Amino acid sequence: MENLKNINPIKVDKTTIINLEKGKLPPQALDLEEAVLGAMMIDKKGVDEVIDILQPDAFYKDAHKHIFEAIFQLFTDSQPIDLLTVSAQLKKNGKLELAGGDFYLIQLTQKISSSAHIEFHSRIILQKFIQRSLIKISSEIIEESYDESTDVFDLLDKAESKLYEVTQGNIKRSSETAQSL
């Protein structure tokens, strides 16, 4: 199991290790993550369509989380969002290299020509995040279920609470987005 931690450059948790041992990767859509981030840097309209749907944790790749955080900070501060401002914000945050550097940002903007379908793509990213969240919660519940000292009713409450958090967070974002349309 120690060897698996060294193989995957993406942050590894118990759920990821379990899935890798079973030959499964966690649900993800890296190509769509790249397309959404690239579109957000080339078209302001794309930012407006996505900013209420996604959060940094929705991205599977850590570099993408950092890039989205920088875009979100620029958006919150009412600053222009483009390749140069995102790069500058990442530098300011000390995360440019963690995000893949300037070359990676350029690659993201070159992979996409418009923000067409960005909302649809961001909803797929959100669905993959929800799937990963459910897998993580389920794995934690399974692990705790084997612990004889765990009170079963406390475990049920904990499971219900965690599932409710996933549901509420995503229903809220979906309804806010629907109202803005």
Tell me the role of every PLM-derived stretch.
Residues 110-181:
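Interdomain "pre-motor" coupling segment immediately N-terminal to P-loop NTPase/helicase cores
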Residues 1-130:
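Noncatalytic partner-interaction/assembly domains of nucleic-acid and motor enzyme complexes
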